[in-house]
């Protein structure tokens, strides 16, 4: 059986090598665009490697040998170590062309379980911002929700740039991860709110905590006001505003809406008054208010 701690048994000693200056510059560009952290950095950090961002990408053959030694010396399972080596061989395969299958050959030789391969290939694509390819692997039913918060955050931020939130929502609906950080939850909810007001409301109702629900509800309203007030894509913003005012709200949610638009942060929006009036029309309250005014005027 292959001894993965022996460098020449893992990495080719001849042929083209990926870790030249161009690769390093390209990787640093990807790292910068991903808020300074690649997914392989997180994996190496989980192995206990100090300053993972300096370990990858390795600089030349000497750097690769040093990284290999660090990985093999880590106090983690063999599968965890092999996962990193698999990732590094994906770099080699990409550099050598489509016929190169060094990563898969290693996995077969050492019996690396398929779910480890799927995860690392998905993270490899994430680090190259090939998000559609990444999700083909990361949404696989055999995988636990590893790095779910970070994956959601990266995909939503990309959605802010493209205006398309289909990828983070596809990942969320496929994996159904329990998000651990408030920032990841906020990013997911932002994607939901910009895609479907109704779905975002339903999501907010899954939270038993009253305060958390109110906060999410107010963020939903804020996202509609922001788009409606900025004049972004008039047809879409009008449709979202109509969807908001037509929601079947509970009594508590109705109060949250009124309070947010009349005395809360929402009152600062140029669209607040219009949304209040639209809601009154939809719920019939405008007629009720008109009748009250008529009675008071003696009509």
From Swiss-Prot:
InterPro entries named among the record's database cross-references: ELYS_dom
Subcellular location: Nucleus, Nuclear pore complex
Main location: nucleus
Domain of life: Eukaryota
Record GO biological process: mRNA transport; protein transport
Family affiliation: Belongs to the ELYS family.
Role according to the record: Required for the assembly of a functional nuclear pore complex (NPC).
Summary of subunit composition and partner proteins: The nuclear pore complex (NPC) constitutes the exclusive means of nucleocytoplasmic transport. NPCs allow the passive diffusion of ions and small molecules and the active, nuclear transport receptor-mediated bidirectional transport of macromolecules such as proteins, RNAs, ribonucleoparticles (RNPs), and ribosomal subunits across the nuclear envelope.
Protein name (database record): Protein ELYS
Organism expressing this protein natively: Chaetomium thermophilum (strain DSM 1495 / CBS 144.50 / IMI 039719) (Thermochaetoides thermophila)
